[in-house]
């Protein structure tokens, strides 16, 4: 079987996967009638120690929901200039969240705490309010480079100290 890791949009299921899907018990998840979705969401919420989980059909859908939860219209997200949420999601940040983007260059897709500190807009009515820092641990434009754990902790600690939301998106497409 050929495995294609370029994107979740080009992956094709194997015969065994298709057979399993055709045998799966399904129902309407809106009415709580899909035991498979319910079991997956329950497992994920318990695994991550969260109150609830939501099954999404794509990485883009997941990213856009996460962005909307952390941004308000007129706000701004700080991210790398080659980030997936900026380059490959059809303008979703502006379209879905009504927010703008501040793009930063970094080493293989990674930002550092000093870049984040200097990118935050001052309290000025003429500028969008910085609301989110989005990091990506990626095999995408970053060429497979991952953040050092201490770098994420440092950025996260800074963001908490200034009451700024932070997200870490894991991207596995080429």
Segments predicted by a language model, with ranges:
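Conserved N-terminal alpha-helix of the aminotransferase class I/II PLP-enzyme fold
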Residues: 13-59, 81-82, 86-87
């Amino acid at each position: 079987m050929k495995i294609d890791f370029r994107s979740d949009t080009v992956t094709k299921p194997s015969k065994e996967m298709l057979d399993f899907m055709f045998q799966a018990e399904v129902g309407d998840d809106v009415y709580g009638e899909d035991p498979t979705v319910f079991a997956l969401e329950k497992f994920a919420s318990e695994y991550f120690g969260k109150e609830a989980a939501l099954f999404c059909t794509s990485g883009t859908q997941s990213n856009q929901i996460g962005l909307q939860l952390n941004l308000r219209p007129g706000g701004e997200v700080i991210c790398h200039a080659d980030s997936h949420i900026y380059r490959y999601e059809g303008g979703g940040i502006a379209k879905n969240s009504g927010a703008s983007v501040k793009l930063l260059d970094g080493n293989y897709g990674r930002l550092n705490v000093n870049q984040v500190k200097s990118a935050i807009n001052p309290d000025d009515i003429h500028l969008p309010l910085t609301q989110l820092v989005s990091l990506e641990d990626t095999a995408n434009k970053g060429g497979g480079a991952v953040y050092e754990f201490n770098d994420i902790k440092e950025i996260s600690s800074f963001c908490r100290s200034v009451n700024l939301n932070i997200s870490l998106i894991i991207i596995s497409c080429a």
